[in-house]
């Protein structure tokens, strides 16, 4: 993985931002860190890294002496919490030092990522698309848009998107749909999440599913040499979510603890109150609560995920980066051509997620250990979601940010920062 990252930096050497050079030279002058350049670093890394044996890596442990060790614990401060004493910590450390621990033996799943695929799908049509893209239509109905760019050499981004999302489910199942991405904790195909991480060692590739209000999607990225692996992972995301009850139970417990810690933050109560008022207590606008975790039934989560990714022909695929339509075509017919397809195409449903109408002034009081005040102003109005309007909103946001920084912070000293944000959101009416 290290050599792969070095190679990626070398391939993108002509696209490095000025800030990266500045940071490197600052470290060079202040910390005497060498700055030989990526050409030298790549050559040196490929010469040195293969010569470092595992034994040499393990010898690093000998550099950690028993004396001069520092231990730090970060624990929540709350009533009823039992904290370890200094002696208990030292005793636990001594017990570990005295143990005879067997060397770790790594088990690797050497099975192929996907089974042998024999697709009869062909390229039905390849034509020029919009904005310089190539539109490839497969004989199974899947459409693929390919755009070659040189902005980031050796990098490829993928997105597959389909209409539907959580809008097709009732409010009572919103949290289930919103967390259906949790299925990836079990891994894909024949590989657990841990085994898959080992299998992908040395590769720069990722594919992750998501389910939003009106869409479901896959988001992928890779370097050029790992394009086929990205398509293999895409195939698994559609066909083979893996069930792992222990991993899912552990994830729910971590989620539950994280939400409990959030509940202890006074700002969380403020955010919950604001969301409730602004969106008329719409469950789709509220965050998941600790008590909601118990309702995330694994069977139903798996079922919903499979429903959303059951028909690949309902998705449009986009590949952007260091990739050509002609070179990717054989991989598309092999992997996307092997996906389950149907003639039915879904549409998202209209779900009322609009902000409350009218002017409201709300004041929330909550006792805090460190008293502070927060003022939040929210404005909304109907406006066309066009490119021009999005640019204008961005310009307005940046201008107001500069204005408030100069007046409220620098001139008045009234606040450290006054964040400003703005966006346009589509709310389909049919």
Residue ranges, per PLM feature:
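M16 family metallopeptidases and their MPP-like homologs
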Residues: 1-50, 69-76, 145-147, 152-240, ...
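Amphipathic alpha-helical segments in well-ordered regions
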Residues: 2-5, 335, 399, 403
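Proteolytic maturation boundary segments
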Residues: 11, 15-163, 168, 303, ...
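Peptidyl-prolyl cis-trans isomerase
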Residues: 52-60, 242-243, 248, 296
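Feature representing long, continuous alpha-helical segments
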Residues: 55, 177, 390, 394, ...
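Conserved short beta-strand edge segments in small beta-sheet-based binding/regulatory domains
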Residues: 244-250, 342-346
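Conserved alpha/beta enzyme-core scaffolds, especially Rossmann-like or related mixed alpha/beta domains
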Residues: 308-310
């Amino acid at each position: 993985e290290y050599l792969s990252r070095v190679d990626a930096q070398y391939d993108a050497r002509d696209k490095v931002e000025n800030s990266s050079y500045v940071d490197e030279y600052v470290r060079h002058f202040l910390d005497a860190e060498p700055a030989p350049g990526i050409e030298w670093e790549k050559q040196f890394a490929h010469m040195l890294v293969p010569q470092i044996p595992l034994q040499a890596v393990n010898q690093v442990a000998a550099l950690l002496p028993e004396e001069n060790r520092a231990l730090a614990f970060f624990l929540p401060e709350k009533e009823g919490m039992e904290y370890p004493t200094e002696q208990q910590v030292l005793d636990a450390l001594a017990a570990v030092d005295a143990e005879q621990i067997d060397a770790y033996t790594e088990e690797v799943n050497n099975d192929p990522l996907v089974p042998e695929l024999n697709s009869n799908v062909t390229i039905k049509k390849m034509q020029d698309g919009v904005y310089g893209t190539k539109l490839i239509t497969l004989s199974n109905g899947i459409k693929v848009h390919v755009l070659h760019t040189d902005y980031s050499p050796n990098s490829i981004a993928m997105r597959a998107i389909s209409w539907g999302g959580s809008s097709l489910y009732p409010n009572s199942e919103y949290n289930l749909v919103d967390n259906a991405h949790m299925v990836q904790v079990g891994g894909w195909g024949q590989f657990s999440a841990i085994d898959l991480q080992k299998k992908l060692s040395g590769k720069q590739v990722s594919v992750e599913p998501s389910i939003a209000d009106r869409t479901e999607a896959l988001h992928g990225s890779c370097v050029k040499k790992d394009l086929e692996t990205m398509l293999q992972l895409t195939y698994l995301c559609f066909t083979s979510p893996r069930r792992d009850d222990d991993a899912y139970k552990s994830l729910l417990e971590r989620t539950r603890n994280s939400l409990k810690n959030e509940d202890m933050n006074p700002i969380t109560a403020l955010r919950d109150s604001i969301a409730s008022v602004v969106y008329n207590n719409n469950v789709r606008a509220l965050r998941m609560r600790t008590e909601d975790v118990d309702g995330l039934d694994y069977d139903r989560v798996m079922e919903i995920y499979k429903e959303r990714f059951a028909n690949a022909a309902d998705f449009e695929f986009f590949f952007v980066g260091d990739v050509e339509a002609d070179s990717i075509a054989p991989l598309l017919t092999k992997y996307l051509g092997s996906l389950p397809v149907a003639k039915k195409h879904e549409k998202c449903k209209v779900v009322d997620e609009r902000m409350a109408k009218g002017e409201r002034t709300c004041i929330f009081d909550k006792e805090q250990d460190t008293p502070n005040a927060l003022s939040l102003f929210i404005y909304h109005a109907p406006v066309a979601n066009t490119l021009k309007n999005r640019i204008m909103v961005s310009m307005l946001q940046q201008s107001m940010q500069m204005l408030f920084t100069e007046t409220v912070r620098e001139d008045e000293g009234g606040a450290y920062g006054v964040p400003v944000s703005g966006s346009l959101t589509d709310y389909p009416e049919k």
